[in-house]
């Protein structure tokens, strides 16, 4: 398993994909999959089934993991 320089809470810039150019905070690092979850990037709508907890069901927006190679540390952050 490789060691990554990007940690939870770091400010990163997306360098590839639909969110290219965005600067945001890392919410979670998934080292085994070499992926990160970045706040407000790669957002998808997930369907929620009807249940006791959620009687109406519906949709929820959620950030999905992206490859760690698609982000770099933002300039000026150490």
Curated annotation (Swiss-Prot):
SMART domains listed in its UniProt record: KOW
Top-level taxonomic group: Bacteria
CDD domains named among the record's database cross-references: KOW_RPL26 (cd06089)
GO-annotated biological processes: translation
GO cellular component annotations of the record: ribonucleoprotein complex; ribosome
SUPFAM superfamilies reported for this sequence: Translation proteins SH3-like domain
PANTHER family: MITOCHONDRIAL RIBOSOMAL PROTEIN L24
Assigned protein family: Belongs to the universal ribosomal protein uL24 family.
Function recorded in the entry: One of two assembly initiator proteins, it binds directly to the 5'-end of the 23S rRNA, where it nucleates assembly of the 50S subunit.
Protein name: Large ribosomal subunit protein uL24
């Amino acid at each position: 398993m490789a060691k990554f320089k990007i940690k939870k809470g770091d400010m990163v810039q997306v360098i590839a994909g639909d969110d290219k150019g965005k600067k945001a905070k890392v919410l979670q690092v998934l080292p085994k999959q070499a992926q990160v979850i970045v706040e407000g990037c790669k957002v998808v709508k997930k369907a929620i089934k009807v249940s006791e907890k959620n009687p109406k069901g519906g949709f929820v927006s959620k950030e999905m993991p992206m490859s760690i190679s698609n982000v770099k540390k933002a300039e000026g952050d150490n």
